[in-house]
A protein has these predicted regions:
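Active-site donor-binding loop signature of nucleotide-sugar glycosyltransferases
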Residues: 78, 188-190, 196
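Modules that initiate DNA replication and primer synthesis
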Residues: 140-187, 198
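A polyampholytic, Gly/Pro-enriched intrinsically disordered region
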Residues: 152-159, 201-214
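Phosphate-handling DNA/RNA-contact segment within nucleic-acid enzymes
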Residues: 7, 49-151, 167-168
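Short, surface-exposed amphipathic charged segments that create phosphate/polyanion-binding patches used
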Residues: 60-62, 145-149, 193-208
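TOPRIM metal-binding catalytic domain and adjacent DNA-binding surface shared by DnaG-type primases
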Residues: 1-64, 102-106, 148, 179, ...
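RNase H-like polynucleotidyl transferase catalytic core
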Residues: 131-136, 182-192
C-alpha cells in the first residue's frame, strides 16, 4: 500500500524532532544500557519530549524508532522506557512494515531476519545487516517478495519458551522459513534474543553463530 508523500514528509520531520531530543534524555540512557547508543544517529533514534504533529499524546516520553526508507520515514515504533506496559506502541492506524529495509536493498549475498527493531540494530552494528519483523504477529505474506534475489536469508528470532510450552519466536521462525525459500534458520540459546546475546557475549557470538552455517 502506497503511503501519501505528505505523510512521509510529516513523519520524516517528526523523526528529526525526536532525534534532536535524544541527548541527555532517559532514552539515551536506555540505548546505552542495550549497547546500541552508537547507532542512534545512523538509525535516527529519538526521544518524544514533545509530541510531533500527527502523533498522539500517549506516545510522549517514549523512545522513538523511525522506519527509514529511501523515500523517507514510513512509520514508527515507540518503546516505553519506564518499565511500564505495554512496552511497544505504534500510532493508531499505522500499517505494518519490515524494519531497516535498507539492509535488503544493500545486501551483498546475505541478510538476517530478526524479531524486533532493537535486535536488527544490534545485528547491523555487529556487522551483519538485518531486517526485523516488528513482533511475532507482524509478518505479512507479501513481505516475502522483499527477499527475492537475496542469496542467503538467515532467520534468527527470539528463543522465548513460555510456561505453557509455547515459543512465539520459534513459531515465527517456522513461518518465515516456509515463506522465504532460500532461508536458513538458526537457533539462539533458550531465553535469548540477538541483543541479549551480543550484550552478554559480544559481537563475536553472533559472528560464530552465522559463520557456522558456511
Amino acid at each position: 500500500m502506497r503511503i501519501n508523500p505528505k505523510l512521509i514528509e510529516l513523519w520524516t520531520k517528526a523523526s528529526h524532532q525526536y532525534h534532536a531530543s535524544l541527548a541527555g534524555s532517559p532514552a539515551e540512557e536506555y540505548l546505552h544500557s542495550r549497547g546500541i547508543l552508537e547507532g542512534s544517529q545512523r538509525f535516527r533514534l529519538g526521544y518524544v519530549a514533545e509530541v510531533a504533529p500527527g502523533h498522539e499524546d500517549r506516545l510522549r516520553y517514549h523512545l522513538s524508532i523511525p522506519y527509514i526508507t529511501e523515500a523517507g520515514v514510513v512509520g514508527f515504533k515507540f518503546r516505553r522506557i519506564d518499565g511500564g506496559e505495554p512496552r511497544y506502541m505504534i500510532p493508531t492506524g499505522q500499517k505494518q512494515h519490515l524494519y531497516n529495509v535498507d539492509a535488503i536493498i544493500n545486501a551483498v549475498g546475505r541478510v538476517l531476519v530478526v524479531e524486533g527493531e532493537i535486535d536488527a540494530i544490534s545485528a547491523t552494528l555487529a556487522g551483519f545487516p538485518a531486517v526485523a519483523v516488528a513482533g511475532v504477529n507482524a509478518w505479512k505474506p507479501h513481505f516475502a517478495r522483499c527477499f527475492d534475489g537475496i542469496g542467503e536469508v538467515i532467520i534468527c528470532t527470539d528463543n522465548d519458551a513460555k510456561e505453557d510450552g509455547s515459543n512465539p519466536g520459534q513459531d515465527l521462525a517456522r513461518r518465515l522459513q516456509d515463506a522465504i525459500p532460500q532461508s536458513i534458520r538458526v537457533s539462539l540459546s533458550p531465553g535469548m534474543d540477538i541483543n541479549g546475546m551480543i550484550c552478554d557475549q559480544g559481537a563475536q557470538a553472533l559472528a560464530s553463530l552465522v559463520n557456522a552455517i558456511d
